[in-house]
UniProtKB/Swiss-Prot annotation:
Plastid keyword on record: no
Lineage: Bacteria, Pseudomonadati, Pseudomonadota, Gammaproteobacteria, Pseudomonadales
One Gene Ontology cellular component: cytoplasm
Known function: May transfer electrons to the iron-sulfur centers of the beta subunit of chlorate reductase.
Protein name (Swiss-Prot/TrEMBL): Chlorate reductase subunit gamma
Superkingdom classification of source: Bacteria
Description of pH dependence: Optimum pH is 7.5.
Naturally occurring in which organism (per UniProt): Stutzerimonas chloritidismutans
Amino acid sequence: EXSEQNPNILEIKPGDTVKVXT
């Protein structure tokens, strides 16, 4: 497993809105 175990973070791009789901 890598370090991509974040169901909250989905493809975050620079300048885009961070979907963390707060």
